Amino acid sequence: MVTLKADEISNIIRERIEQYNREVKIVNTGTVLQVGDGIARIYGLDEVMAGELVEFEEGTIGIALNLESNNVGVVLMGDGLMIQEGSSVKATGKIAQIPVSEAYLGRVINALANPIDGRGKISASESRLIESPAPGIISRRSVYEPLQTGLIAIDSMIPIGRGQRELIIGDRQTGKTAVATDTILNQQGQNVICVYVAIGQKASSVAQVVTSLQERGAMEYTIVVAETADSPATLQYLAPYTGAALAEYFMYREQHTLIIYDDLSKQAQAYRQMSLLLRRPPGREAYPGDVFYLHSRLLERAAKLSSQLGEGSMTALPIVETQSGDVSAYIPTNVISITDGQIFLSADLFNAGIRPAINVGISVSRVGSAAQIKAMKQVAGKLKLELAQFAELEAFAQFSSDLDKATQNQLARGQRLRELLKQSQSAPLTVEEQIMTIYTGTNGYLDGLEIGQVRKFLVQLRTYLKTNKPQFQEIISSTKTLTDEAESVLKEGIQEQLERFLLQEKL
């Protein structure tokens, strides 16, 4: 038997006393009263903040949304299947935030900014709050630089500027995502960081978008935030704010960003589900009273920053799905009133083969020609006017058979202009190509062609001008104006190609 001497015992006790740490930890804890449907009710947690993160015993994280007199309503950021009644919950003292860094470019992440593309961890030294205040009035300046989508119909008649919020609205399967992804593809070489947020989409649809961006080299400057249809409602509700926080990180570093929310109807549905389960009073269409604030605080974060803050910008393209063209439903009207214009995609036009199926009549950009280069303003005015007159005449022509020659000519011109606006998916055009295309149509060069020949001719014309008249593109890109010299080069090129084309067609 080992015997300890008295001085050894006193040494051990002295060491233990020296090692004793007097730190007192006060942990704000509570007990689970009820759990289910992605919601937990907690008793205790007396000093919890609204929106604070709480941690359950088995590791699930939740957000305290309802602070009631005798319990706290928490939404879970996981399935919560292992949470039991009576288990303990502790407040973390933190509001939801995500790590941010340049390393996120080219990655696919979830609403908590964790990678889901199987390519390992993402290193980040900084973090940002998911919900941060939007820039104030003094921090902004008016939108003046164009953000080209590569789609003639949008860039000429519904122009989008850097820092603008433009809603893309339409029924299901009308090409809303296609317009958004084409815009991302067109930012190649424009020094714009793109963030694509997929909310409640099918995983196969998200994979398709990611693949198409990868094939065309667009993932290099793009971040995809995805919460698919099987994700908890809490994460679908948070995904847009995560995307906005990432875009803001780049915006405040003097860069230009484009963020696409696809789509906000699904986010509103996820928020409605959470609110009803938390027993908040339902309003119109069973949405909670603060569903307007849900979207307004998100979209107000898009801005063109002032020169003091570095002139960075964040352009938002929210997408909203309508039911059988009903633009006057609750969520569409809310988002229309928050944004700076809308691009309306029509199922009838889509089915008639007019793609992109943009209804130019009811689409609008509230920034307007401030977001266009001078050369585009010069050619787009005539296009708008002629298409508006054509739409009016077309409706009238259905009732009248004997039309005079001038009316017939105007109808023929309108049909060719409508043909000129058609574009294949994933084939965005540069602004110089758009200007030459519109100029060809509005100045009557297409009037002598059959409608079926228009697109074929325009494709050949673009190739011909690129190889034989490169000075046209050089003048437009350097001066941003359709000068007399550029116009004469363009006229010459169109005439030459038209003669060649008509000869080919005769053979």
Swiss-Prot record:
Entries under Pfam families matching the protein: ATP-synt_ab, ATP-synt_ab_C, ATP-synt_ab_N
GO cellular component: chloroplast thylakoid membrane; proton-transporting ATP synthase complex
Record-listed ATP binding positions: 170-177
Positions where Phosphothreonine occurs in the chain: 257
Keyword field contains Translocase: yes
Main location: plastid
Record field: catalytic activity: ATP + H2O + 4 H(+)(in) = ADP + phosphate + 5 H(+)(out)
Documented EC number(s): 7.1.2.2
InterPro entries: ATP_synth_asu-like_sf, ATP_synth_asu_C, ATP_synth_asu_C_sf, ATP_synth_F1_a_nt-bd_dom, ATP_synth_F1_asu, ATPase_a/bsu_AS, ATPase_F1/V1/A1_a/bsu_N, ATPase_F1/V1/A1_a/bsu_N_sf
Record keywords: ATP synthesis, ATP-binding, CF(1), Chloroplast, Hydrogen ion transport, Ion transport, Membrane, Nucleotide-binding, Phosphoprotein, Plastid, Thylakoid, Translocase, Transport
Positions in coiled-coil regions: none
Family of the protein in this entry: Belongs to the ATPase alpha/beta chains family.
Annotated HAMAP family: ATP_synth_alpha_bact
NCBIfam families linked to this entry: atpA, PRK13343.1
Complex and partners: F-type ATPases have 2 components, CF(1) - the catalytic core - and CF(0) - the membrane proton channel. CF(1) has five subunits: alpha(3), beta(3), gamma(1), delta(1), epsilon(1). CF(0) has four main subunits: a, b, b' and c.
Summary of the function given for this chain in its UniProt record: Produces ATP from ADP in the presence of a proton gradient across the membrane. The alpha chain is a regulatory subunit.
Protein name, entry field: ATP synthase subunit alpha, chloroplastic
Organism listed in the record: Aethionema grandiflorum (Persian stone-cress)
Taxonomic classification: Eukaryota, Viridiplantae, Streptophyta, Embryophyta, Tracheophyta
Gene giving rise to this polypeptide: atpA
